[in-house]
A protein has these predicted regions:
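Hydrophobic cores of alpha-helical transmembrane segments in multi-pass inner/ER membrane proteins
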Residues: 43-53, 120-131, 187-188, 232-242
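Membrane-interface helix/loop boundary segments of multi-pass membrane proteins
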Residues: 13, 128-155, 195-200
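Functionally important transmembrane alpha-helices
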Residues: 174-233
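Juxtamembrane helix-loop-helix connectors linking adjacent transmembrane helices
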Residues: 24-39, 59-134, 138-144, 167-170, ...
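Alpha-helical transmembrane segments in multi-pass membrane proteins
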Residues: 4-10, 14-55, 78-83, 108-117, ...
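Membrane-interface capping segments at transmembrane-helix boundaries
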Residues: 56-61, 241-254
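Aromatic-anchored segments of alpha-helical transmembrane domains
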Residues: 10-18, 88-96, 156-165, 208-217
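Residue-level signature of the transmembrane alpha-helical core
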Residues: 10, 43, 84-85, 119, ...
Length: 254
């Protein structure tokens, strides 16, 4: 049930949030790219989903949940392509917009090797999140609220959770607000891809991982303005929300 899932996720998050908030904690230096220890909360939705699935149906249900996350649907190749290419495209447009606005930007230093090294940890993190958000929580939520409203509710919850790690990375208030708003839009896009593919968690994982890779590669280790990027994300999210089915789909009907 969605309520049990969200409660379990928050219970798993709290200790990591507390650890990440300790300014003198040596744990703050364990993760790369200035990530706070609270970034490990990315694994919490998946852990909560597997635990609840195991409780409901023992090991078979948990294995089914995990295997569903890698369910590739050949007929939906265009959706998988969108999942991989949409966010790099948004970041390129964001870079062009910042150039046009006269923003001071470092020279782009894109490295295929760096991008390849980033993919593995970000796929692991995306798997941990999307196994819970889309693989476990979304369908029951959409069955109750309809696809559009479920997308908005999940987006608000997800963005609120991200705000704490954003603060713990030391960014100023404007950056945190802009990034949090953009994050809500990203979840709506993830739901759009998930529904478009016909309930593929793999599409959600692909988009989520490429979002993080694109952010850190722009153009040097995440040097971007979340308000500029956020406007582009919200525009696409608004279109995605408009074309989504209003009510429950056949997959998530109660």
């Amino acid at each position: 049930m969605p309520a049990a899932f969200f409660t379990c996720v928050v219970a798993l998050w709290i200790p990591l949030w507390i650890l990440g908030a300790r300014p003198q904690s040596e744990l703050r230096n364990l993760l790369p790219f200035n990530l706070p220890i609270s970034a490990l909360t990315a694994l919490c939705p998946g852990v909560a989903a597997v635990a609840l699935a195991f409780r409901a149906g023992n090991g078979r249900a948990a294995r089914r949940l995990i295997s569903h996350a890698w369910d590739y649907r050949r007929a939906a190749n265009r959706w998988y392509a969108a999942a991989l290419l949409v966010m790099p495209g948004i970041m390129l447009l964001s870079y062009a917009a910042m150039r046009a606005l006269g923003r001071s930007l470092p020279e782009a230093n894109l490295s295929f090797t760096d991008a390849t090294l980033l993919i593995v940890p970000f796929v692991i993190g995306a798997f941990g999140e999307e196994l819970g958000w889309q693989g476990y929580a979304f369908d029951p939520l959409a069955g109750r609220l309809g696809v559009r409203l479920a997308a908005v509710v999940l987006a608000l919850f997800w963005a609120s959770w991200h705000a704490i790690p954003f603060v713990e990375t030391g960014h100023d208030a404007d950056w945190v607000v802009g990034q949090t708003i953009a994050t809500a839009g990203l979840r709506v896009i993830i739901v759009w891809l998930y529904v478009g593919v016909g309930g593929s968690v793999l599409a959600a994982i692909d988009f989520h991982a490429m979002t993080n890779v694109s952010d850190f590669m722009f153009p040097v280790n995440g040097y971007y303005d979340p308000f500029v990027t956020g406007i582009l994300v919200l525009l696409l999210a608004a279109v995605a929300l408009r074309v989504m089915p209003r009510g429950a789909t056949r997959r998530n009907a109660p």
